[in-house]
Amino acid sequence: MEKLLERVNHILEALPYITKYSGKTVVIKYGGAAMAKADLKESFAKDIVLLKYVGIHPVIVHGGGPEINRLLDSLKIPTEFIHGHRVTDTQTMEVVEMVLTGKVNKQIVSMINSQGGKAVGISGKDGNLAKAVKAPIEIELEGKAKQLFDVGLVGRIESINPEILHNLQKEGFIPVISPVAESVEGDSLNINADTFAGEIAGALKAEKLILLTDTEGILIDGKLATGLSRGKMKEYIRKGEISGGMIPKVECCLAAIDQGVNRTHIIDGRVSHSILIEIFTNQGIGSLIES
């Protein structure tokens, strides 16, 4: 009986959060280990379906880099890199779009639907969801100032038209978005999935933006940091305490906050049911950044 009561108490712990977030939108960037391991994929799909059933509106933006690499290798398409950044020419972009929109996106949709959800897969091109422009990559070379490099059909979001997302949500669907957008010239552009998720969250005025990563969260001096303000994050970046691949994730969170998103989270996607732990428990998981 005690074990049963303990389970009931765990369920009741979620009640105030269900009440608080019911009817609200949560944008989730799905990538990393959570997309690679079978048990984590299943727990992710169950988390998303449960959110929908308790009245929360999840919107998913996904990555898919490893799948792109595998297909490029199998097709023997040569890849040029500039200081570690892939140059995306027309042939490479065709593969990127094929993998992200045609394969990975549909796998995620099927995964969610198999758990009882109603997911619909789209890209930034559908319903004029996103318009983008080509964007060079800023790279800081050792001992030199930052420089801009043209890496091809890689873009940044210029505008989001969330009408298609509102319509899908109204009909009870779960949008699953691949990070491909169209330029005004009609070119397909590959968009960083974290950045895309942040822009979607801002356009929807989401309650939360959650980035699933392959780390515990933001580590300062080797310790997990949470309850972080915008100003504190800027300070950490300026001092070099946040560096490398974590910087664009943090900047994406800050941009979302500037657009009206209440809370942003960088959490460990390697932990089973990390989304539910973050949303429905008192302790949460990972790093919280808020205004």
From Swiss-Prot:
GO cellular component labels: cytoplasm
Instruction: List the protein's name.
Output: Acetylglutamate kinase
Catalysed reactions, as listed in the record:
N-acetyl-L-glutamate + ATP = N-acetyl-L-glutamyl 5-phosphate + ADP
Q: List UniProt keywords, sorted A-Z.
A: Amino-acid biosynthesis, Arginine biosynthesis, ATP-binding, Cytoplasm, Kinase, Nucleotide-binding, Transferase
Enzyme type, top EC level: transferase
> Does the record's keyword annotation contain Cytoplasm?
yes
* Membership in a protein family: Belongs to the acetylglutamate kinase family. ArgB subfamily.
Binding annotation for substrate: 64-65, 86, 190
GO molecular function annotation: acetylglutamate kinase activity; ATP binding
